[in-house]
Amino acid sequence: LLSREATQLGQTLELRIQGDVYKVKLPLIGAYQAANALVAAGVVMASGGDVESLLSHLARLQPVRGRLERAVITKSGAPVYVDYAHTPDGLRAAIAALRPHTKGKLITVFGAGGDRDTGKRPEMGAVAVADSDVVIVTDDNPRSEDPSLIRADIMAGAPGAHEIGDRRYAIAFAIEHAEPDDIVLIAGKGHDQGQIIMGRVLPFDDVEVVRECAA
């Protein structure tokens, strides 16, 4: 690997392979994704794989569903990524992965699950406001808890964050305010397709909602 340039939609890798220099646009976010892709590429090359075919496949790689998955590019040109991060460490990692790719503002939308570790809520709020430019606290899976109390726990560690309980409205707000050089992160639910509220599982897919809000 000669160089790596982060972009809003992935990263451009400059590679030296068998003495020749190649550039490939890897449509994945994060330095760790580049490292993983290059390890896999090395295995293919060691097995006698064709360089041109290998580079073509690298340029078409897709992330695991709900793991820094690019759901849409907004009308303003800002990409929106959906990730399963639902712990302080997970949220910190997702934001850190996106930060080098962000020329403008990094807008983070997230919440915390009900009937789970309450101590992580203010910590997640603190992580979000420390590492994002705009933070929107919303509902995740409140389960049997009062959603407003969960948000209050998060907000205790997130001074300056916006609070929008309805997750769809929170996503729409983020998309509406995203400018061309911004990146939006919708964290917490990833590939989940339901929202658990008072014992009921209501249909809710972050990726689909993002696309509907951006349409």
PLM segments and residue spans:
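A short beta-loop-beta micro-motif enriched in histidine and acidic residues
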Residues: 32
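A generic structural motif
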Residues: 14-18
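Short nucleic-acid-contacting surface segments enriched for D/E, G, S/T with interspersed K/R
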Residues: 35
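A short, compositionally biased
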Residues: 5-12
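ATP-dependent carboxylate-amine ligase
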Residues: 9, 19, 27-29, 38-215
